[in-house]
Amino acid sequence: MPNPGDAGASLGAAALAYGKKLLWKDAFLGHRTEQSLTRTSLQLAEQIVAHLLEHKVCGVAFGRAEFGPRALGNRSLIADPRGPDMKDKVNEIKKRQKFRPFAPAVLEEHAHKYFEPNVITPYMQHVVNGTKITLQTLPAIVHEDGTCRVQTINKFDNTIFRQVLEIWYRETGCPVLLNTSLNIRGEPMVNNVEDAWRFEEKYDVKVFY
């Protein structure tokens, strides 16, 4: 269950009342943002990585929004986790305290090199320890106590976010991206194209959809 809060409890109660076992395929149950017909998902992923390689933060709004409190790549702000200043840059955009770190999204097949214990956590529900390489090279996604709240993306995940991570890894040798929710502190998530336009104009952050 990708929503450990009250909304998840209500869904669980509804499932119990329904009386049948539900197969949970993914956490994307919200509003759908239609992808532009002028480019393929691969072209979109390549454009996003090119933007990130310029040391810029960007938003992504793909397909259906996530159900639950975690941004899992369909309504996310993403950035390079390696730069020592990136945490401050994203916190400034989101109007959060500077000390607060962000979550990592990692290609599942490389997670064991960066996090321990090595857990499969596609819904960002586990806090684990960063390995030595993480503590030394990925300061933007590590808490003060050396832990990280991780999202793993498996090789069977046919999402644009997986493509972004694969291309990012190919270009940088780093299979990890900083991932946080596509909203500003105290405001709702970007949900549709109109929200994305407003976000871009107000906060000067490119949103890809």
Regions found by a protein language model. Name each.
Residues 1-209:
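Flexible beta->alpha loop and helix N-cap segments adjacent to enzyme active/binding sites
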